[in-house]
């Protein structure tokens, strides 16, 4: 029970941290782009990845973190995650440039639906529960309603926004798949992704001339701009780790819904701090519907977690009862069946072994030789029924179905 509580607290804490870091990074990046006209986005991405790679490598060499050294086998395990992570961050930065901050958040609110669909196709873990499905559909409808209130953005921003949602959903699902297929944790995943993506991002930053023209940017003379730039780099590293950790502990859909919950504050700050969008009635209605979907999702996930914990408690209950049974006490009482052959047969049985049978019954019912009473017999039968039910439940829960060769089984062997 204590481990279950710790797991829930850890999952909630990581989800909250992911929402805080993600929302802060979106606001600061939009502030850099809108207020200071900072357009060197590839440089931001390159410095974020290289900072994470150098920091984790230094901590690994000092022995402060348990991360295996980088190698080809390790890189091969996270190759798809590294590619999608790099592509997702690039598309996110480009969509922030072409869209207003509230409209960018509206696009991101479609992430749970896309993540759920890709997860069903890739992970093949079955359809989601009706509560989760209803929450995802309501959230997506709210995003579409809010998007109808703002169609003044850059067309390239809308294209990159759609692509960012698709790639981000695939990235989260692939993280969840990697967590099930490999033995490595989220810190190892971030280390491999950062080391693998840094050389490619360095080449891209020079190919886009961001690393060349960034030195002549006049905003470096403003200390506030420099502080915001450094904060974006550090918060970006923290957000990448919390994204991986939240997906490892919870799920891809839960991580995407964290973005939906934190977007309420992001939209509010975006409307107050930036004047590139006006809060229309459609936009406000969409945000309200979106928030309702988020609340329904939280309630549905809470009910699923509660039901799962009840199943685990029911499965663990017979083990505790078996441990309480002593060595000289049997789990149930054997009762003697009544005779079916009449009085003569019964008397013959008594003449042959009446005292012996009475002594056996006394030994079975009580180790001290006290005769059994009707109350103890009923209590023993109830306990035996309960134990039998729990044993059947454990067998059903732990059954693994195996493929059988029906041709060999049904083959008729010739008689000798």
UniProtKB/Swiss-Prot annotation:
Gly residues bias: start-end ranges: 339-352
GO CC annotation terms, alphabetical: early endosome membrane; endoplasmic reticulum; endoplasmic reticulum membrane; Golgi apparatus; synaptic vesicle membrane
Transmembrane helix keyword on record: yes
Cross-referenced InterPro entries: TPT_transporter
Main location, first listed in the record: membrane
Stated regulation of activity: Inhibited by proton uncouplers that directly abolish the proton electrochemical gradient.
Subunit annotation: Could interact with ATG14, BECN1 and PIK3C3 that form the PI3KC3-C1/AIC/autophagy initiation complex; enhancing the formation of the AIC and promoting autophagy.
Function: Probable UDP-glucose transmembrane transporter involved in UDP-glucose transport from the cytosol to the lumen of synaptic vesicles. It is involved in platelet dense granules maturation. Alternatively, could function as a molecular adapter enhancing the formation of the PI3KC3-C1/AIC/autophagy initiation complex to promote autophagy in dopaminergic neurons. Could also regulate the plasma membrane localization of the D(1A) dopamine receptor/DRD1 and dopamine signaling.
Entry's family note: Belongs to the TPT transporter family. SLC35D subfamily.
Protein name: Solute carrier family 35 member D3
Species in which this protein is naturally found: Homo sapiens
């Amino acid at each position: 029970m204590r481990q279950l509580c710790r797991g829930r607290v850890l999952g909630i804490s990581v989800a909250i941290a992911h929402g805080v870091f993600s929302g802060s990074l979106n606001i600061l990046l939009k502030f850099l782009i809108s207020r200071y006209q900072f357009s060197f986005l590839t440089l931001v991405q390159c410095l974020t990845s290289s900072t994470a790679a150098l920091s984790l490598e230094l901590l690994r060499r000092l022995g402060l973190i348990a991360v295996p050294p980088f190698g080809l086998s390790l890189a091969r395990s996270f190759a798809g995650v590294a590619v999608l992570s790099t592509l997702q961050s690039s598309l996110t930065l480009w969509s922030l440039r072409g869209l207003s901050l509230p409209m960018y958040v509206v696009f991101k609110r479609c992430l749970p639906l896309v993540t759920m669909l890709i997860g069903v196709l890739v992970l093949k873990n079955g359809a989601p529960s009706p509560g989760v499905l209803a929450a995802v559909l309501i959230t997506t409808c709210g995003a579409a309603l809010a998007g109808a209130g703002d169609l003044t953005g850059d067309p390239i921003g809308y294209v990159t926004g759609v692509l960012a949602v698709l790639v981000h959903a695939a990235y989260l699902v692939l993280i969840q798949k990697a967590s099930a297929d490999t033995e490595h944790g989220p810190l190892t995943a971030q280390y491999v992704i950062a080391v693998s993506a840094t050389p490619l991002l360095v080449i891209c930053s020079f190919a886009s001339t961001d690393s060349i023209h960034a030195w002549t940017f006049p905003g470096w003379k403003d200390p506030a701009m420099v502080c915001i730039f450094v904060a974006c780099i550090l918060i970006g590293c923290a957000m990448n780790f919390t994204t991986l950790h939240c997906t490892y502990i919870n799920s891809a859909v839960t991580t995407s819904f964290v973005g939906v919950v934190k977007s309420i504050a992001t939209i509010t700050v975006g409307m107050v701090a930036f004047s590139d969008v006006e809060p229309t009635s459609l936009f406000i209605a969409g945000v309200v519907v979106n928030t309702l979907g988020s609340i329904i999702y939280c309630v549905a996930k809470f009910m699923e977690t509660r039901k799962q914990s009840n199943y685990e408690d029911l499965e663990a209950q017979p083990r505790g009862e078996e441990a309480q049974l002593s060595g000289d006490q049997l789990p149930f009482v054997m009762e003697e069946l009544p005779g079916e052959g009449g009085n003569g047969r019964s008397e013959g049985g008594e003449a042959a072994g009446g005292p012996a049978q009475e002594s056996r019954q006394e030994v079975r019912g009580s180790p001290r030789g006290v005769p059994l009473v009707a109350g103890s017999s009923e209590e023993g039968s109830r306990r035996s029924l309960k134990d039998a039910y729990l044993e059947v439940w454990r067998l059903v829960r732990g059954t693994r179905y195996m493929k059988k060769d029906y041709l060999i089984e049904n083959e008729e062997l010739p008689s000798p």
